[in-house]
């Protein structure tokens, strides 16, 4: 089964606005419009069987609406695997985590940079204590700021990993968008999965190969970061640049199946 573990779709009322915001922040012109129908078409063209759909509440008031959206996707679209969201400022986290678990939500997305908290915030540590091993935890990591100044970075995630050994942790963007040297130093060998999203455009072949070897085939997951990138194109580039065999690609896809219980 082929799985894209890093995609985003948005409610039709806000999709255009969010896609524009992504372009403004990252300077990347998105290939997609952020709608489920577009993602569905692209995943079918790429031979992707299922997509993990991610959202991150940028304010406490967004937690319930965002998770309602995730639960509705879970109920209505078997090809999508939605992750839930939490926020350090949300007051009734245990109840909301219970609700997500009861509705079959398998994971949580954390984006400290967009959500307005640091990865070393004690409030995030409190959330992780509640999470235990109930959810797969996918973290956005990295940006253009130096690690010590950025809300997320490989060093902070390594500290989280050490403090909370139970949950499956995924570091997006091959361990840290624009923080790849730090990812090699801080995260490789630390029982952290990495996904390939938003990395093909920014890594040369040598660094991509180094990251792949350092984390190991059994800890690499395929992710496109739709709507920024297209799964078919990203899968093709990943396969060619790393010279992956069919067995390599099957193993990478099996990693996602395994951690998602599929």
Regions found by a protein language model. Name each.
Residues 6-12, 140, 173:
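Histidine-centered divalent metal-coordination motifs
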Residues 9-10, 143, 176, 228:
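Short active-site segment of divalent metal-dependent hydrolases/proteases
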Residues 49-50, 58-139, 143-145, 151, ...:
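Active-site gating/metal-coordination segments in enzymes
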Residues 2, 51, 70, 80-82, ...:
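Hydrophobic/aromatic residues located in beta-strands of well-ordered beta-sheets
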Residues 106-107, 120-221:
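Catalytic pocket-lining loop regions of alpha/beta-barrel enzymes
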Residues 38-42, 66-73, 96-100, 123-127, ...:
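A general structural detector for well-ordered alpha-helical segments in enzyme core domains, enriched
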Residues 1-5, 15-50, 98, 214-221, ...:
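Mid-to-C-terminal alpha-helical segments outside catalytic/metal-binding sites
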Residues 6, 43, 70, 100, ...:
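Conserved, mostly hydrophobic/aromatic
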